[in-house]
Structures are given as structure tokens and as C-alpha cells.
């Protein structure tokens, strides 16, 4: 096979892959998100104020009032294999409505959104940070950005302050954005149907349950 034919075949492969991606993995637009919310295909409670929370292809979620902080001064390290270790090295802090939480530079905190989100078996959710907050050094997830088909609960935020100045977070502020992507077909086993799903129906920033993995 000549070099030109190889290049042509490579380009055709790229085109086919892109076609399959756009055919089966579409991100919902603002119009489709409104339809999904209206038909209860996607359920967000309390209902978002679309005038301020709906983006071109995402819904902004607001910060809840519950935080889980790490008490690093009492423990030298974390042992993920130890049962209930998080209860020993973390503590829950609840902030009053419209209250604030100060994140110090380099701090890592678990939090939840004010909203509960329910995703159908033929969609997945993806949590993203907001650019305006990212420019201040705030990240909203360290690794877990994907919410499986069938998810039902409050999304947990893995907040980190990468900057050199403290950041004041206010309960109820728009903290992150969630997009929704179509699957090629409905999941055979949605998240809430999984026997060993560790975080289904959560409504608080629960500690890591990695020790439960088989």
C-alpha cells in the first residue's frame, strides 16, 4: 500500500470515528435540557431557575451547606484499606443558610450541591467547573466528573483551592455546571440498580468507601 493510500485510509478512519461519536454520544443542548426537565426525563430538585442557571449545553448547580473537612493535624497519613477510616480523619461542618465557608490555599474539602439530580438510564452526566471560579484557583472535582446512567442523589464536589489566597464560598452560589450526554443505548444496569453501588441516593458529602471494593 502506498503512503498516500495509507494517509487516505487514516483520514477516513478519523472521519468514521467522529461520525460514530456525534451519532451516539451527543451532548444535550439548552433546548433539549429544557425538554428533558419538562418531561421529567431529567429531574433536578429544587427546580433550577433557567433564566440564570441554564447555559448553552449545561445546567449550573448551586453550593449546598454541608462540608466534610480533613483533620490532618491528628493523623500522619490515610490508609484507604482501613474500614471507616474517613470517620476518624474527617468531620462534617454545616453552614447556615446564606452562610459562607472559607477555603484556605491548598485545602481539599468534600461538599455537595444544593440540588438533587436524577439521571435516566440512557444519559450520563458530566460535572464541570465554572471558568470564573477556576480563574480564582477553585476546582470542583479532582477525578470524579462522570455521573453514571441511573444516578440519583446530590452530586458530591471534590473542592480544591489551587491558588495562594483563601476563597470565600457562599451557600447557594452557582458552583459548577452539569452537562448531559446521550448513550448509544440505555445502560443494562443503571447506577442505582447496582448491588454494590457505594454512593447511590446520597444527600451529604459521604466519606470514601473504597474499602468496600471487592
Predicted regions and their residues:
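DUTPase catalytic domain/fold
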Residues: 16-214
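N-terminal amphipathic/basic-hydrophobic helices that include classical n-h-c signal peptides
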Residues: 1-25
